[in-house]
């Protein structure tokens, strides 16, 4: 057999995997570098002011956005940046489960569960109504309502095939989400002293208003571990509302979507892998299979991954995108989010 014979498909698979991993390295290293500078600046603040007024997590977003505003990363950087912004942050969310006991849910009681469901339903109705009043199509209004009220782009991706939304409607509904998501992560902690919120209250507020589970983690880190735990639990409960919403929309859409193909939404579209991992680790922690000595190291790893991911998030946000977003879509998304924030602020004062 000739030594020059072409390699078999089996030999090609490892090479393909290695090349994919290699493609991630430049972008990941860039995000780590931005995160490292952010950590150094936080230490400098601590040395000068004796308090980090702008924490590394927020600094990483701001530095990433500043860098992105005058330098568009070349394609060789993009894969690693995207991986850091999504997968690394999802891993951080999953690991957070190791520090949470389901006793926190039991302590909150049925009132919190009912309140979360009520907020989601009210937000869905108000967001849809506002979007329609602003002249947006029914499908686009549904996408905006689900994205704002449940879990951002994940909800939009799950609902879009159910209602037969086209690419333009999907793009319009998600184009403003990245920027608003960053604004919420940066701005929400400012409400802690302004509204004199406790750690529990702020966690509930973040869980009710921030778009995605990973972003809740980022928004609550400045308020401490208790706030992060509560916020993540509230957000997970909110995400679970996606199932009933999709079922309801499927029943409604089947009546006026006769010309479109019926699409089944898979289980992992409704419940992402990192949420399942979070719940699994939380279960193990509640059963004390995961010992308390693990919580400290896991929390440090989670914090590191979160800062790296926030650097990636900043690097992926181009504020100039605002110029390309339609005025009515921008108004609908912004007003809906403000109303959701107002409802949530009123609610959290019930919980101490």
From Swiss-Prot:
Residue spans crossing the bilayer: 21-43, 53-71, 88-110, 114-136, 143-165, 175-197, 204-226, 236-253, 265-284, 294-316, 329-351
Key words of the record: Cell membrane, Membrane, Transmembrane, Transmembrane helix
Chief location of this protein within or outside the cell: membrane
GO cellular component term, pick one: plasma membrane
Domain of life: Bacteria
Pfam families to which the protein is assigned, alphabetical: Cons_hypoth698 (PF03601)
Membrane topology, record value: Multi-pass membrane protein
Localization annotation: Cell membrane
Entry's family note: Belongs to the UPF0324 family.
Protein name: UPF0324 membrane protein blr3189
Organism in which the protein naturally occurs: Bradyrhizobium diazoefficiens (strain JCM 10833 / BCRC 13528 / IAM 13628 / NBRC 14792 / USDA 110)
